[in-house]
């Protein structure tokens, strides 16, 4: 993608995630509990649980922690009171932001999300105000130097919808979000290990921010990410570090 390095952004994202591993584990435990409660404790027949368990493995969460979270979810001891709520809003320059939460107190969560938006130059929107600007997809990113032809053949055979080579040489593979685990398994069986593999809300268009605007936007995104009830934050803003 012209103007910025998607590969650099992904490396930054991974480094930031590693720095917040304890917080990531907390979020994953909540997601595993809710997924198990809603769809049962067998990851083979529960796609949402499979995704959460795979994420836990990628985050190096001990298997005992995962099993306990599944057991609690199935048993209803925890997770039963968590409610999924999506908030939508805008950052500076009209950048679109989606905030997905799991909460046991809707009043607390909406107040915290609204406060973060307003404190850092954004504002809350109504349901559906920005979600149409994103596609719910499975996304894989492979390092520069990966064989494009071989990856494209394997990806399309696995059921992927699109394979794109970015300006920095990294390769992006997209699939229907429901097919994510199947495509991931097939690619790994073919020897292709993605640096990033996730189900995400991918923006249809991106807005680049530099300088002071980039700093402001990053502060807003960090404030939202750091809220305890927040599971994921998606945006069409691309923060360019100078």
Curated annotation (Swiss-Prot):
The keyword Transcription regulation applies. Its main location: cytoplasm. GO terms for biological process: regulation of DNA-templated transcription. GO terms for molecular function: DNA binding. GO terms for cellular component: cytosol. Gene3D superfamilies: 1.10.10.200, 3.30.70.980. Belongs to the TACO1 family. InterPro entries: Integrase-like_N, TACO1_YebC-like_2nd/3rd_dom, TACO1_YebC_N, Transcrip_reg_TACO1-like, Transcrip_reg_TACO1-like_dom3, YebC-like. The keyword DNA-binding applies. Keywords: Cytoplasm, DNA-binding, Transcription, Transcription regulation. It holds the Pfam family TACO1_YebC_N. This is Probable transcriptional regulatory protein BTH_I1015. It comes from the Bacteria. Disulfide bonds: none annotated. It is found in: Cytoplasm.
């Amino acid at each position: 993608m012209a103007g910025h390095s998607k590969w650099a952004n992904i490396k930054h994202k991974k480094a930031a995630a590693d720095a917040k591993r304890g917080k990531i584990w907390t979020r994953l435990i909540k997601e595993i509990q809710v997924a198990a409660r809603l769809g049962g404790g067998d990851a083979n027949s529960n796609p949402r649980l499979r995704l959460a368990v795979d994420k836990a493995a990628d985050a190096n969460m001990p298997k005992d922690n995962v099993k306990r979270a599944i057991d609690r979810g199935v048993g209803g001891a925890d997770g039963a009171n968590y409610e999924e709520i999506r908030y939508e809003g805008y950052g500076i320059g009209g950048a679109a932001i989606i905030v997905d939460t799991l909460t046991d107190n809707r009043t607390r969560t909406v107040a915290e999300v609204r406060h973060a938006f307003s404190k850092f130059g954004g504002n809350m929107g109504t349901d559906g105000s920005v979600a149409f600007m994103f596609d719910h997809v499975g996304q894989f990113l492979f390092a520069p130097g990966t064989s494009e032809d071989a990856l494209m053949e394997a990806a399309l055979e696995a059921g992927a919808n699109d394979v794109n080579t970015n300006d920095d040489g990294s390769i992006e593979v997209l699939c229907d979000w429901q097919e994510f685990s199947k495509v991931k398994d097939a690619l790994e069986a073919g020897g292709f290990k993605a640096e990033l593999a996730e189900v995400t809300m991918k923006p249809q268009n991106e807005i680049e921010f530099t300088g002071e605007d980039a700093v402001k936007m990053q502060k807003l995104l960090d404030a939202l990410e750091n809220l305890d009830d927040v599971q994921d934050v998606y945006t069409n803003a691309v923060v360019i570090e100078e």
